């Protein structure tokens, strides 16, 4: 994600978020009427309920350029590029590429537990899949579980 966009999103959703580390997901949306904030306000409560109901730790959405455009928990990997940024060689970077490079939108990739830096080194496993419109991949999605 471009530096200015990354900095603005991390400032709004991590640094200026009134909730403490580990509870950043409680903010429905940052102040302001940007398209991102309006969309966050509309969909974030649903993703948060879905995450809790299914027992996930986090849910991620990526565009095909590798930008982490959405995360329920907004940790250090939020708003970064998994193709070029600091987490490109991370476990999450590998899971993004598995989804983006999958030969079919039906393919689901599973990744076993191992320490994940942006989650403060806690063991994490991931499930990744393309998000397709018919047969054309539009985005990639990822679910994170913690041990």
Task: Name each model feature, range by range.
Residues 147:
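Flexible, glycine-rich terminal cap/loop adjacent to redox cofactors
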Residues 32, 36-144:
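Extracytoplasmic/periplasmic ligand-binding sensor regions of membrane-associated signaling proteins
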Residues 1-30:
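Alpha-helical transmembrane helix bundles of large polytopic membrane transport and channel proteins
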């Amino acid at each position: 994600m471009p530096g200015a966009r990354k900095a603005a999103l991390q400032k709004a959703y991590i640094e200026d978020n009134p909730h403490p580390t580990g509870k950043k997901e409680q903010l429905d949306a940052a102040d302001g009427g940007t398209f991102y904030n309006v969309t966050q306000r509309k969909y974030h409560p649903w993703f948060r309920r879905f995450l809790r109901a299914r027992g996930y730790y986090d849910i991620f959405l990526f565009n095909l350029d590798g930008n982490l455009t959405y995360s329920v928990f907004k940790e250090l990997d939020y708003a970064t590029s998994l193709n070029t940024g600091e987490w490109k060689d991370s476990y999450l970077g590998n899971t993004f590429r598995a989804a983006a490079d999958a030969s079919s939108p039906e393919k689901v990739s599973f990744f076993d537990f191992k320490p994940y830096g942006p989650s403060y080194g806690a063991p994490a496993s991931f499930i990744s899949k393309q998000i397709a419109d018919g047969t054309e991949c539009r985005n990639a999605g990822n679910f994170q579980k913690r041990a």
